[in-house]
Amino acid sequence: MVYSTKLGEIEITDDQIFVFEEGIPGFEHLKKFALIFPEETFPIGWLLSLEDSHVGLPVVDPKLVRPDYDPVVPSEDLEKLGVSNQDELLFFCVLTIPPGKPEEATINLRAPIIIRQNTKKGMQVILENADYHLKHLLSEEMERAKSMV
């Protein structure tokens, strides 16, 4: 199906659509999202609302930015998605990219988007790990990742 999104008219398939029963913080009223990875922005993907064409969040696999990223999802959140083991989940972190200042981009490692692919459900969780913050400077994290290789 073709949807109007923040990125324009986009063909979206059923396997790209996920339901966030609780919405996501700041957008609790929005429940239906698509996760896409356009060639022109890869490895950055987009979590796009299918209910409000103005809402779209840039996301990335946190392991690309912080190879030692090791989140522990609270058990109550695992229960909400119907899993007992977080290995069944996909993790994405939201990027904030100030207009005209990509060098000031940050990644939110504290509140990842988690997705259970086989049930098409997702949610944003708040981790208790004090090492992860809402705003990590992306350039610093990328330098740190290079030094780990």
Swiss-Prot record:
One GO cellular component term noted in the UniProt record for this chain: cytoplasm
Extent of the signal sequence: none
InterPro entries registered for this protein in UniProt: Flagellar_assembly_factor_FliW (IPR003775), Flagellar_assmbl_FliW_dom_sf (IPR024046)
Record keywords: Bacterial flagellum biogenesis, Chaperone, Cytoplasm, Translation regulation
GO biological process, one term: regulation of translation
Subcellular location: Cytoplasm
UniProt function note: Acts as an anti-CsrA protein, binds CsrA and prevents it from repressing translation of its target genes, one of which is flagellin. Binds to flagellin and participates in the assembly of the flagellum.
Subunit structure: Interacts with translational regulator CsrA and flagellin(s).
Family to which the UniProt record says this protein belongs: Belongs to the FliW family.
Protein name per the record: Flagellar assembly factor FliW
